[in-house]
């Protein structure tokens, strides 16, 4: 097969830039106005979630002239949920964005935009970022990194052929991902049905200080010579799914980590809107951005605590209680002041059994998803080596 040339993204892009948070310039978000797009406005596959859109004034939009969006602009998340890719459409405009989304504007006639979007979501690009990670807890990508990305660029006819085939498989992957999302939504709906919205105590349950009901502690389990080290990039946003397990020798564990056991719930205080809450299935160590919580066995079920923390109501509330513009973290003083509803343990355990059944269904869907992803990756390998 004829070798396909590789180019840097900067060689084909008219513009690579990013936006700014309006509040840093003295502007506030408002009920309506110009659309302001953030990472949470897009699903994993880049689908636009209109109801998540924030809004800014026309004056603010003009002030943020550098990041005014156009139809066809590619948005690439460079902070938090790294590597989420979306293409700006007419329905999103007028619009602006913040510093967590890189804007990639490609206008050349010899380039097929759907092909570029596919390449940016592929292992070809992910592998380049993985090499830059170098053990940090939370990878952030700079505009320089985006400019330096190398991608294969065949003739336009080949781009169209490749994108057409891969989009079909990508459609299967998206369908499986939506199945998983529906199962997650089912669990959330069941939670609300049984317990009501967290923090509102609609059912009139007894409440308890969250740190009394689930003490925070770095508790060392029975660790082997090779230890599971959990960093935030291994946790899927919104679902808390552990994407992969990184193992290290126990002697390599540094001071900026916390120990946890399989009885804990791990809550990420960094960028709480990403909703990274994990129920670990074995002992290990984690980045200190994770808070290990240990629910009292006779009062609080682990699954109940986990989904209480994952609930939309809690995520919305806690996302406003952060400090730090570039690396927003939950205020731990505020977190410790929270009270959690304490339904009867029997009801919590009924919910946990429901979660367990849904998890079994998710395993089957995930298997089909993994097979489709494997096919996608093998075809990418066939096309580009």
Name each region found by the language model.
Residues 1-20, 148-164, 175-222, 337, ...:
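Non-catalytic DNA-recognition/assembly elements of restriction-modification systems
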Residues 2, 21, 78, 94-102, ...:
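A short glycine-rich beta-alpha junction/loop motif
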Residues 2-45, 62-64, 203-242, 253-258, ...:
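Low-complexity, Lys/Gly-biased intrinsically disordered segments
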Residues 33, 52, 98-100, 226-228, ...:
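A generic structural signal for short beta-strands and their flanking turns/coil linkers
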Residues 52-55, 167:
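Short glycine-enriched, charge-decorated loop/helix-capping segments at active-site entrances
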């Amino acid at each position: 097969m004829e070798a396909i040339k590789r180019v840097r993204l900067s060689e084909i892009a008219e513009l690579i830039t990013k936006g700014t948070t309006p509040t840093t310039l003295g502007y506030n978000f408002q009920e309506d106005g110009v659309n302001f797009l953030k990472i949470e406005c897009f699903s994993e596959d880049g689908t636009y979630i209109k109801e998540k859109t924030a809004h800014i004034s026309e004056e603010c939009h003009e002030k943020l002239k550098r990041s005014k969006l156009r139809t066809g602009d590619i948005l690439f998340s460079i902070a938090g949920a790294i590597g989420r890719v979306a293409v700006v459409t007419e329905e999103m405009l007028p619009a602006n964005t913040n510093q967590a989304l890189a804007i990639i504007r490609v206008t050349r006639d010899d380039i097929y935009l759907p092909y570029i979007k596919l390449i940016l979501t592929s292992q070809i690009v992910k592998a380049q970022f993985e090499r830059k990670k170098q053990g940090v807890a939370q990878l952030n990508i700079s505009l320089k990194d985006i400019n330096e990305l190398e991608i294969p660029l065949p003739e336009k006819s080949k781009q169209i052929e490749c994108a057409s085939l891969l989009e079909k498989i990508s459609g299967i992957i998206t369908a499986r991902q939506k199945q998983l999302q529906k199962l997650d939504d089912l669990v959330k709906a069941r939670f609300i049905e049984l317990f009501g919205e967290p923090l509102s105590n609609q059912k009139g349950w007894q409440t308890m200080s969250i740190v009394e009901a689930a003490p925070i502690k770095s508790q060392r389990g029975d660790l082997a010579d090779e230890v599971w080290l959990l960093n935030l990039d291994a946790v899927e946003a919104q679902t808390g799914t552990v994407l992969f397990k990184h193992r290290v020798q126990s002697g390599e564990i540094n001071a900026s980590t916390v120990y946890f056991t399989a009885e804990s719930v791990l809550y990420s205080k960094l960028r709480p809107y990403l909703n990274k809450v994990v129920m670990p299935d074995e002992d290990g160590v984690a980045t200190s951005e994770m808070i290990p919580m240990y629910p009292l066995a006779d009062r609080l079920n682990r699954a109940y605590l986990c989904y209480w923390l994952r609930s939309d109501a809690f995520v919305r509330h806690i996302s406003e209680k952060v400090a730090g513009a570039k690396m927003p973290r939950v205020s731990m003083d505020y977190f410790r002041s929270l009270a959690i509803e304490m339904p009867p343990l029997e009801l919590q355990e009924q919910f946990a059994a429901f979660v367990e059944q849904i998890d079994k269904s998710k395993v089957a869907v995930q298997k089909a998803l993994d097979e489709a992803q494997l096919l996608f990756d093998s075809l990418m390998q066939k096309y580009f080596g």
